[in-house]
UniProtKB/Swiss-Prot annotation:
It is found in: Mitochondrion; Mitochondrion matrix, Mitochondrion nucleoid. Keywords: DNA replication, DNA-binding, DNA-directed DNA polymerase, Magnesium, Mitochondrion, Mitochondrion nucleoid, Nucleotidyltransferase, Transferase. Its cofactor is Mg(2+). This is DNA polymerase subunit gamma-1. GO terms for biological process: DNA synthesis involved in DNA repair; DNA-templated DNA replication; mismatch repair; mitochondrial DNA replication. Residues 127-137 have a biased composition (Acidic residues). GO terms for cellular component: gamma DNA polymerase complex; mitochondrial nucleoid; mitochondrion. It catalyses: DNA(n) + a 2'-deoxyribonucleoside 5'-triphosphate = DNA(n+1) + diphosphate. GO terms for molecular function: 3'-5' exonuclease activity; chromatin binding; DNA binding; DNA-directed DNA polymerase activity. It comes from Gallus gallus (Chicken). Gene3D superfamilies: 3.30.70.370, 5' to 3' exonuclease, C-terminal subdomain (1.10.150.20). Its EC number is 2.7.7.7. InterPro entries: DNA-dir_DNA_pol_A_CS, DNA-dir_DNA_pol_A_mt, DNA-dir_DNA_pol_A_palm_dom, DNA/RNA_pol_sf, POLG_palm_dom.
Amino acid sequence: EEGWVPGPSLISLQMRVTPKLMRLAWDGFPLHYSEKHGWGYLVPGRQDNLPAASAEPEGPVCPHRAIERLYRQHCLQRGQEQPPEEAGVEDELMVLEGSSMWQKVEELSQLELDMERPGRAEQSQMQDEDGLPELVEESSQPSFHHGNGPYNDVNIPGCWFFKLPHKDGNENNVGSPFAKDFLPRMEDGTLRAAVGRTHGTRALEINKMVSFWRNAHKRVSSQVVVWLKKGELPRAVTRHPAYSEEEDYGAILPQVVTAGTITRRAVEPTWLTASNARADRVGSELKAMVQVPPGYSLVGADVDSQELWIAAVLGEAHFAGMHGCTAFGWMTLQGKKSDGTDLHSKTAATVGISREHAKVFNYGRIYGAGQPFAERLLMQFNHRLTQQQAREKAQQMYAVTKGIRRFHLSEEGEWLVKELELAVDKAEDGTVSAQDVQKIQREAMRKSRRKKKWDVVAHRMWAGGTESEMFNKLESIALSASPQTPVLGCHISRALEPAVAKGEFLTSRVNWVVQSSAVDYLHLMLVSMKWLFEEYDINGRFCISIHDEVRYLVQEQDRYRAALALQITNLLTRCMFAYKLGLQDLPQSVAFFSAVDIDRCLRKEVTMNCATPSNPTGMEKKYGIPRGEALDIYQIIEITKGSLEKK
């Protein structure tokens, strides 16, 4: 081309040559692209595909010796600064909340369903074996490295080819090592520019830094904004000492779909999904840019462990009708993060993973995800785990928490046991194990001419786990003729009623019970707050709810009364839940919010300064917004003297 000069030109992260130019390596192994398998990496040491010494090479020779040296160098460096096994996980990865998690849970639970259906286990095992990329001999795979491979149809002399791990499973190809799912691996040093390549490392850092804004800027710039003239502003704003006529005052109208999911949760792509401010993410202070006009405050709170408590109280009402009567409920009520006795800390200790990871597993499990989900997630969080190790950890976790399946025999099953004189081990509650059910089926098929399978099971249940009672209750609601939420009696979509869906979508229906009850919780809170604001003349209005979090725009002089109203609302809402489930009292540990936030901008914690690359001086220096207040019930009572009356 005319005007061409040596050096990089129009190179973007989307180009296949970029990882090579940066000399990107995965655990010390250089990245390589295969048309068939997508991005992977080369592991040196393969002998069976080396050309004979006498043969003339047709094209360029793979420098497998240099790759070996690179890996040795990486091992030496790793020996000096060994990364922790549980790598820090990026916010985006933890967002398995809401719809994205839900899709994943549904897909993975389908796997579990397939495994539970008769005859499917063997079939799926055969399919798995058929679906393997290539059954490789012991000699043609490295002894010092395991991963997703080797794929020996990629014939690189002296090297095995392994695929990069994909978040949706190893059968999927990775299209770009710069995708946001690889940010945690960049942070923990698994994916980095090879030793001594400072430019590559810096490019990765910049990519990580702009990742949030690259994904969010179009949504942010397309927000609907209404600017207000001075005459349209309340007097409380225009008469406030901080009011400036040179400033523009307006409001964003978030385009919320009010019941956008099957569980009636709101859907909105920007504000309901925005992550918290991070020091290494451009634009991540986005939420804090929503600031109140002079003379107003944002009063709000997060409902503590909302869905965990709802699930726990359902199980307790089902088990003994007393708060804290199940292990799961006791941990929810009495567990403390500082003592390591809360649910997430216990799960983390049981399986040997970090608390943050345990949180994702716990919510996934309560949403109805099965063991395949846990296995895949374990391998996603720690790519150095083998399939077998992940399976063992997942089995251990599910046996301790969810328990094991037990079965109540149908009349046909009881008759077969009697007629065939089979010895089955019945528990106190009359249930039998899966092995006994299989034995009855096997003997019945062997001794009868009937080709159709015998229907020996009346219904299934969970037993022996800390959460068994809770899952039994959730499944009993989900499988009832017309599932409805226990508190406000909201019915499930007719498309998911058992008469239509039969045994399908059980995961969705179990999740619906908990998440739709959480929406009942929100609706009760909104109604209670509206009533208290009107009854006690509190000058404020509802601003936004972000799933288990509510925010109210309140005039400054009423902010503490609004905070007390919020605490009373939480008390009334929890009481309503307990009463509807037949419980006549409420533990104090869940009666009130641990803290009500009074602030001048939207942020996760009132103490966060939200310093980011695009807001380096933070909220206080640049915008004059000091730290807010986070008040517990005792502090609020002290300030308001326990009264909502206007003084």
